[in-house]
């Protein structure tokens, strides 16, 4: 079966989290035209995606660009910002992204989401990505 990304053509970006099972062959994905990974780093004020750090290392080793996202919830925006920035370890090439979507446990409101984004932008001096 032909992978969808081989039909669409490069450059392509894939979204990963701990919900995507291993093994993931980043070299094979790169050969198929995937040039960037956006990976969940954190959620809320305490969850850390256990696959973030090892997959970051493997994706970069395969020659891909790498970006981190934070799955926002209704907990404290300042707490979420602090948590995300501590875990994501955003280097100068990364902007960070905030994922805002319905969450059965704790959906962030638009006002809170805008405040969270503004806090990250102010702290880093760059504009983070809005991801939904």
Region annotations inferred by a language model:
Residues 16-18, 41, 68-72, 98-102, ...:
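A cross-domain feature marking catalytic cores of carbohydrate-active enzymes
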Residues 19-20, 26-27, 36, 51-56, ...:
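Broad hydrophobic/π-residue packing in well-ordered secondary structure
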Residues 11, 34-48, 56-76, 95-97:
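Short, well-structured secondary-structure segments
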Residues 8-10, 65, 125-128:
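Short beta-strand/loop segments at the ligand-binding rim of alpha/beta enzyme cores
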Residues 23-24, 46-50, 76-79, 104-110:
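Extracytoplasmic/secreted cell-surface and envelope-processing proteins
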């Amino acid at each position: 079966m032909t992978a969808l990304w081989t039909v669409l053509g490069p450059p392509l970006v894939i979204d990963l989290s701990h919900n995507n099972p291993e093994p993931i062959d980043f070299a094979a994905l790169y050969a198929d035209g995937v040039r960037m990974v956006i990976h969940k780093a954190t959620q809320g004020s305490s969850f850390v995606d256990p696959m973030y750090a090892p997959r970051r290392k493997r994706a970069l080793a395969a020659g891909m660009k790498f970006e981190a996202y934070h799955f926002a919830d209704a907990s404290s925006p300042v707490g979420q910002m602090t948590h995300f920035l501590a875990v994501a370890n955003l280097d100068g090439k990364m902007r960070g992204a905030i994922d805002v979507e319905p969450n059965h446990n704790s959906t962030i409101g638009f006002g809170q989401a805008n405040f969270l984004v503004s806090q990250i932008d102010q702290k880093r001096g760059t504009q983070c990505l809005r991801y939904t």
